[in-house]
Amino acid sequence: MKYLIEVIGETFLSISDPIDHRHWFLSKEQHAYEFIFMNLFYLVVIFIGINLNKKREYENQRKPKPIPEKDYPSLLNKIVAIILAINVFLNLIYKCLRGWRVVFFMLQPCHIVSTIYCYCLLTNNYQFGRKVFKISIYYILVTIAALVAPDLADLTLPFECYNFFIQHYALLIAPFLLQAYRYNIEFELPYALISQGLFGISHFFVFEIFCFISGTNINYMLFPPPLGEFSYLTQESYRVGIAFILFILALGIGRLVILIGSKIRSTFLLKNKSK
């Protein structure tokens, strides 16, 4: 294990291109340990989720097939999708204006989830869109975190701050619209686990590697966000600690969004359609 840690640490050192003095806030050994164990943890979570889902699907084969949920076409869905698409495009322009390194920030969850929600809001492939939504609904926690503690220090270009808030409020609204007007899913633990497993691997594998290559702090994988009075969170364990906190919170908040969206659907849409 010690040799493996050394090899991974040296690999990170060889591909890294620092542009900030905090680039090595965590040691190469710390990065290597977390790269191995956190990715293993999230792979196990995905494996459990997939197997639970297979078991659930097998059990459902024996039951009568439910009547498919009705999709209520909504102009609001299209408006929110267009807003998200425009925001992603504007963010890409902003990043390109700052140089090739900054373009890697397009991997940030807000931009990826914006693209996913655009697809879910507009796709004609209802069944696949439903599965994608079952996974992506739990990422609303990232949106909430960004709105509660917005990091606007680097947003200096015209309209960039406004664009940030417009995008994130659209991201906040989108899951409720998708639940109320389109998919009306239920909380399913297998999909919740797959969701969090993918989220974790995107950080501790994909973001980790691209952070070293570009030198940019994608979703704070190199060094912590400005935490103010909570400076004790900036110790070496901040990534692991926040990862597990988000893991638990995402399941609870995702479930709450499902319940609220279903309530909106049953209270307003179904009653209005029955009149």
UniProtKB/Swiss-Prot annotation:
Protein name, per record: Transmembrane protein 164 homolog
Share an example GO biological-process annotation for this protein.
Answer: positive regulation of ferroptosis
Q: Which family does it belong to?
A: Belongs to the TMEM164 family.
Q: Does the keyword Metal-binding apply?
A: no
Membrane topology per the entry is:
Multi-pass membrane protein
> What residue intervals traverse the membrane?
32-52, 74-94, 102-122, 135-155, 157-177, 193-213, 240-260
What functional role does this protein have?
Positive regulator of ferroptosis.
Q: Which GO terms describe its cellular component?
A: membrane
Localization per Swiss-Prot or TrEMBL:
Membrane
